[in-house]
């Protein structure tokens, strides 16, 4: 029995990440090889031609799972009936811009898109915010879409999570699929805390802690953390543009695990609405370790937190509280 198509919105679809993400969705990478999709692509009016070109390419690729395409600059049309919304569109920080300027631009974007989603999206729409500042954009979206359940509004830290797994696999010369349960705590920014204290590697003699195998606490507590924190900047330096392919791939991972579930014994990182777990202030969108089942995420509870971790977790929470204050000041 063929499944009903799911409607997936990508905002900022004509941009770099959109160009990498849209074919992944159309191929079934995000929702599964048996799940038909109807793509809704939104961008701003100056990108109309580019958006139409993307639509032409999607037609030309003849994706079997792609059952329809809505390409539009109208936010209401874009949001109507969508089951999944991936918010890639935002206002990027340009040289010489103050953080407050960027924040106020994004606050107005996310305020209007929140209203459109609230009024027109499918009832249990799942939202993933990718555009920076991702955690705070997601918080604004939550504020202005009160009827969307708060558990349905998330932000992307899976890219950082995957970067952490990648660094460990390179260091130990193992397959990345054999590394699991790294954690990204906090903000999708350079204050995030990549934590390996609970991470393990599959070896011929069973699962072993990453700390034990790396056997270099100095590296794990300094270079590993800063490499993951600064990876986005390193890619901009190398490519002269921001990471698009890896961001798109991790957005698919985030939604796929959320919708289809995480493997037994594995947790992943998602930016979700804090309930006060691990002493993180409630009312922030903060990256936690989660497991997913039946289309719902649950924060992994009871992990021991050492003093080193506590400081880092508090520092990134502090930054998020400051961003929240800044964002709210832009509303007035």
Swiss-Prot record:
Q: Where does oxaloacetate bind?
A: 99, 132, 163, 188, 243
What keywords does the record list, in alphabetical order? Cytoplasm, NAD, Oxidoreductase, Phosphoprotein, Tricarboxylic acid cycle
Catalytic activity line of the entry: (S)-malate + NAD(+) = oxaloacetate + NADH + H(+)
Its tissue distribution reads:
Highly expressed in young panicles and immature seeds. Weakly expressed in roots and leaves. Expressed in stem and sheath (at protein level).
Recall the GO molecular function terms of this protein's record: L-malate dehydrogenase (NAD+) activity
Question: What is the top EC class of this enzyme, as a single word?
Answer: oxidoreductase
| GO annotation terms (biological process) | malate metabolic process; NADH metabolic process; oxaloacetate metabolic process; tricarboxylic acid cycle
Annotated catalytic residues? 188 (proton acceptor)
Localization recorded for this chain is: Cytoplasm
Q: What is its main location?
A: cytoplasm
* Gene3D superfamilies referenced in this protein's UniProt entry, alphabetically: Lactate dehydrogenase/glycoside hydrolase, family 4, C-terminal, NAD(P)-binding Rossmann-like Domain
- EC annotation? 1.1.1.37
GO cellular component terms, alphabetically, are:
cytoplasm
Domain of life here? Answer: Eukaryota
Q: How is it modified after translation?
A: Phosphorylated after gibberellin treatment.
Q: Which residues bind NAD(+)?
A: 16-17, 43, 90, 113, 132
- State the family named in the UniProt similarity comment for this chain: Belongs to the LDH/MDH superfamily. MDH type 2 family.
Q: Which PANTHER family match?
A: MALATE DEHYDROGENASE
The annotated subunit structure for this chain is: Homodimer.
| Protein name (record) | Malate dehydrogenase, cytoplasmic
């Amino acid at each position: 029995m063929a499944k009903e198509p799911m409607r997936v919105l990508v905002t900022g679809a004509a941009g770099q990440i959109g160009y990498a993400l849209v074919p992944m969705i159309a191929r079934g990478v995000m929702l599964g090889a048996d799940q038909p999709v109807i793509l809704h692509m939104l961008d701003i009016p100056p990108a109309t031609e580019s958006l139409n070109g993307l639509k032409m390419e999607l037609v030309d690729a003849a994706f079997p799972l792609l059952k329809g395409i809505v390409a539009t600059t109208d936010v209401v049309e874009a949001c109507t009936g969508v089951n999944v919304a991936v918010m890639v569109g935002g206002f990027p920080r340009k040289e010489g811009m103050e953080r407050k300027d960027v924040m106020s631009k994004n606050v107005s974007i996310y305020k209007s898109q929140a209203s459109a989603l609230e009024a027109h999206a499918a009832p249990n729409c799942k939202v993933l915010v990718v555009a920076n500042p991702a955690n705070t954009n997601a918080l604004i979206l939550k504020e202005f879409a009160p009827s969307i359940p708060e558990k349905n509004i998330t932000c992307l830290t899976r890219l950082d999570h995957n970067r952490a797994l990648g660094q460990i696999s390179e260091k130990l010369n193992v397959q990345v699929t054999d590394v699991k349960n790294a954690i990204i705590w906090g903000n999708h920014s350079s204050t995030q805390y990549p934590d390996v204290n609970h991470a393990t590697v599959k070896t011929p003699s069973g699962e072993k802690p990453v700390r034990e195998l790396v056997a270099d606490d100095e590296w794990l507590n300094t270079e590993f953390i800063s490499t993951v924190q600064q990876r986005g900047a390193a890619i901009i330096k190398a490519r002269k543009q921001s990471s698009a392919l890896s961001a798109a791939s991790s957005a698919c991972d985030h939604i796929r695990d959320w919708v289809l579930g995480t493997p037994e014994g594995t947790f992943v990182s998602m930016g979700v609405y804090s309930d006060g777990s691990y002493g993180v202030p409630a009312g922030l969108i903060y990256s936690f370790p989660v497991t997913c089942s039946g289309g719902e995420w649950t924060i992994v509870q009871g992990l021991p937190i050492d003093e080193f971790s506590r400081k880092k977790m508090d520092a990134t929470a502090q930054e998020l509280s400051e961003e929240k204050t800044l964002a709210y000041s832009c509303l007035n």
